[in-house]
């Protein structure tokens, strides 16, 4: 049985979140949570929240045992980009791209 959780429009770039996602892909849930707890990046906090949501979904909706679950798949897609302007010297302006991501975690008991 598979259970899915998503966080859409997460305010962090997909490139940064993929570094964390690669660390826990395919691991058992307790080990993955341990890795995320000791990682001091903002992306680790975002991924941990989505993983905990997937665990809650599996326990509540499907009645699965949380300790037996494994991260079957985790992927990060690019979300929309907010464009902002930063004033510079001599009347010019630079563009700032505030990137977002869509985090998807799938846990399975197999």
Swiss-Prot record:
Gene3D superfamilies: Ribosomal protein L22/L17. InterPro entries: Ribosomal_uL22 (IPR001063), Ribosomal_uL22_bac/chlpt-type (IPR005727), Ribosomal_uL22_bac/org-type (IPR047867), Ribosomal_uL22_CS (IPR018260), Ribosomal_uL22_sf (IPR036394). This protein binds specifically to 23S rRNA; its binding is stimulated by other ribosomal proteins, e.g. L4, L17, and L20. It is important during the early stages of 50S assembly. It makes multiple contacts with different domains of the 23S rRNA in the assembled 50S subunit and ribosome. The globular domain of the protein is located near the polypeptide exit tunnel on the outside of the subunit, while an extended beta-hairpin is found that lines the wall of the exit tunnel in the center of the 70S ribosome. The keyword Kinase does not apply. CDD domains: Ribosomal_L22 (cd00336). One of its GO terms (molecular function) is rRNA binding. GO terms for biological process: translation. Keywords: Ribonucleoprotein, Ribosomal protein, RNA-binding, rRNA-binding. Belongs to the universal ribosomal protein uL22 family. The gene is rplV. The lineage of its organism: Bacteria, Pseudomonadati, Pseudomonadota, Gammaproteobacteria, Enterobacterales. One of its GO terms (cellular component) is cytosolic large ribosomal subunit. It comes from Buchnera aphidicola subsp. Schizaphis graminum (strain Sg). Part of the 50S ribosomal subunit. This is Large ribosomal subunit protein uL22. NCBIfam families: rplV_bact. PROSITE patterns: RIBOSOMAL_L22. It comes from the Bacteria. It holds the Pfam family Ribosomal_L22.
């Amino acid at each position: 049985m598979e259970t899915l959780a998503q966080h859409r429009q997460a305010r962090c770039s997909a490139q940064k979140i993929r570094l964390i996602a690669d660390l826990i892909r395919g691991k058992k849930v307790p080990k993955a949570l341990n890795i995320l707890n000791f990682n001091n990046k903002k992306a680790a906090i975002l991924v941990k929240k989505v993983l905990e949501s997937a665990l809650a979904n599996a326990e509540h909706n499907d009645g699965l045992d949380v300790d037996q679950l494994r991260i079957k798949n985790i992927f990060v897609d690019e979300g929309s980009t907010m464009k902002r302007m930063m004033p510079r010297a001599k009347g010019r302006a630079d563009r700032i791209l505030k990137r977002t991501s869509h985090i998807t975690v799938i846990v399975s008991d197999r």
